[in-house]
Curated annotation (Swiss-Prot):
Name of the featured protein: NAD(P)H-flavin reductase
EC number: 1.5.1.41
Tree of life domain: Bacteria
Subunit-level organization: Monomer.
Signal peptide coordinates: none
Pfam families associated with the record: FAD_binding_6 (PF00970), NAD_binding_1 (PF00175)
Record bears the keyword Acyltransferase: no
CDD domains for this protein: flavin_oxioreductase
Organism of derivation: Escherichia coli (strain K12)
Enzyme class: oxidoreductase
Keywords noted in UniProt: FAD, Flavoprotein, FMN, Ion transport, Iron, Iron transport, NAD, NADP, Oxidoreductase, Transport
Amino acid sequence: MTTLSCKVTSVEAITDTVYRVRIVPDAAFSFRAGQYLMVVMDERDKRPFSMASTPDEKGFIELHIGASEINLYAKAVMDRILKDHQIVVDIPHGEAWLRDDEERPMILIAGGTGFSYARSILLTALARNPNRDITIYWGGREEQHLYDLCELEALSLKHPGLQVVPVVEQPEAGWRGRTGTVLTAVLQDHGTLAEHDIYIAGRFEMAKIARDLFCSERNAREDRLFGDAFAFI
């Protein structure tokens, strides 16, 4: 693990509660797609955030931070970023990084800002094998929570093997994507998951339900199921 001081070079409010933050570390860094960093608030308080950028992007790290009055944990980090324009991070962390089996079909599952985890893996996987069979399921309460959907749709035009499945719980009139939960959408679309590598970014309870359902009902291999939550459940 490396501790780095980072300059905050840009902060973009993507939605009312989600910020795209770019930081530039003061020294060389490395990580694997799908790993996360820890923002050091003090010696005993370190807070995890997935890196949305890829390991090949050497000049900066991109974070997607969902900060609101109901998520004071992340809001405190954003308050520091906006006040000090610099942060200290520990990097890298996590074992749910992209594996090298480039021919296996892949499923990425993310809710909300969990997309940052999926984005790093997706872009890295496409760089390695532009024709890989990849399906990304991105869920949110409302359409606005799928804040980078246009980027994904543009990628799908360039990569015929990429399928983008947006899912919202509370659709507005005119919504053309799926309705409900991402896990239900995966189960509806796949009779078997035995040959897939599956990467999941979500709450512990969602990850546990996914593991139980995918393995028992769709023959997913537990050793090909990846997510930071699985280190704790």
